[in-house]
Swiss-Prot record:
Residues 1-77 form the HTH rpiR-type domain. GO terms for molecular function: carbohydrate derivative binding; DNA binding; DNA-binding transcription factor activity. This is HTH-type transcriptional regulator MurR. Homotetramer. It comes from Shigella boydii serotype 18 (strain CDC 3083-94 / BS512). Pathway: Amino-sugar metabolism; N-acetylmuramate degradation [regulation]. The gene is murR. HAMAP family: HTH_type_MurR (MF_02108). Gene3D superfamilies: Glucose-6-phosphate isomerase like protein, domain 1 (3.40.50.10490), Winged helix-like DNA-binding domain superfamily/Winged helix DNA-binding domain (1.10.10.10). SUPFAM superfamilies: Homeodomain-like (SSF46689), SIS domain (SSF53697). Represses the expression of the murPQ operon involved in the uptake and degradation of N-acetylmuramic acid (MurNAc). Binds to two adjacent inverted repeats within the operator region. MurNAc 6-phosphate, the substrate of MurQ, is the specific inducer that weakens binding of MurR to the operator. Residues 128-279 form the SIS domain. InterPro entries: Homeodomain-like_sf, HTH_RpiR, RpiR-like, RpiR-like_SIS, SIS_dom, SIS_dom_sf, Tscrpt_reg_HTH_MurR, WH-like_DNA-bd_sf. Residues 37-56 bind DNA.
Length: 285
């Protein structure tokens, strides 16, 4: 679990005291080896129990476990930075050669994958896969780049026998949402979790008794609050981006994992359908 990533992405979810702790940890991560919870509490003007509760909120058993994990993450990131600092900065500039751009893009996508996979709650993921597998009907919603991810997932799911709707038109998305029933599933893909169209569809789906699964960022958002289940994605986009490249990479890693998990649940039948699909498309050549 990448605690530094969770701290930096979950700021809006923190209380005032929790934000003080988060800011302190981020600003002093290189010096945490010599910091105790008592020292932190005194410096921040809060109780030691607040620090312990903060650590537990992030998934650690206590402050000591969180502190050691942060030290380890910081050391690992320093090692990676030292090996790539000359060429792989955090943003692409107008002066970069295509070779440097390629290396930066690859590194950014690698980080998106590493950080997203590190945040997976695999027990929750298994539960989500089971819920999807039992759904009579699945709707997938998304806008822009997220819509492309959704369309790819819809094709994969249809290939193994699921009834899926993934419409590009937002009015049609809303119309489908209000017609969902209990047992149906809506998979809402939105990194920000705040797009009006996606939130509206999630509200409609939930009102009808459907299960809402959100593929979104760690930040608090209307979609995150509406969803029955969330699958977290991490991405660092920069100013020289005409498209959300690393975001799509992170989202695709989640949707591909869902697909493979569903294939595993019913492997014999799924593989037969994949084979039949391949045979049919071969006849079109």
């Amino acid at each position: 679990m990448l605690y530094l990533t969770k701290i930096s992405n979950a700021g809006s979810e923190f209380t005032e005291n929790e934000q003080k702790i988060a800011d302190f940890l981020q600003a002093n991560v290189s010096e945490l080896q010599s910091v105790s919870s008592r020292q932190m509490a005194k410096q921040l003007g809060i109780s030691q129990s607040s620090i312990v509760k903060f650590a537990q909120k992030l998934g650690a058993q206590g402050f000591t476990e969180l502190r050691m994990a942060l030290i380890g993450e910081y050391s690992a990131s320093r090692e990676k930075t030292n090996t790539t600092a000359l060429h792989l900065h955090s943003s692409i500039t107008s002066d970069d050669s295509l070779e440097v751009i390629a290396r930066k893009l690859n590194r950014e996508k690698e980080l998106a994958l590493e950080q997203t996979c590190a945040l997976f709650d695999y027990a929750r993921l298994q539960k989500i896969i089971e819920v999807i597998s039992k759904a009579p009907f699945i709707q997938i919603t998304g806008l822009g780049g997220s819509a492309l991810v959704g369309r790819d997932l819809s094709f994969k799911l249809m290939k193994i026998g699921y009834r899926v709707a993934c419409e590009a038109d937002t009015h049609v998305q809303a119309t489908v949402s209000q017609a969902l029933k209990k047992g149906d599933v809506q998979i809402a893909i939105s990194y920000s979790g705040s797009k009006k169209e996606i939130v509206l569809c999630a509200e409609a789906a939930r009102k009808q008794g459907a299960t809402v699964i959100a593929i979104t960022s760690l930040a608090d958002s209307p979609l995150r609050r509406l969803a029955h289940f969330t699958l977290d994605t991490v991405s660092g986009e920069t100013e020289w981006r005409s498209s959300s490249m690393s975001t799509r990479t992170a989202q695709n890693s989640v949707t591909d994992l869902l697909f493979v998990g569903l294939v595993q649940l019913n492997d014999v039948a799924s593989l037969k359908m994949i084979q039949r699909s391949s045979e049919l498309t071969q006849r079109l050549k």
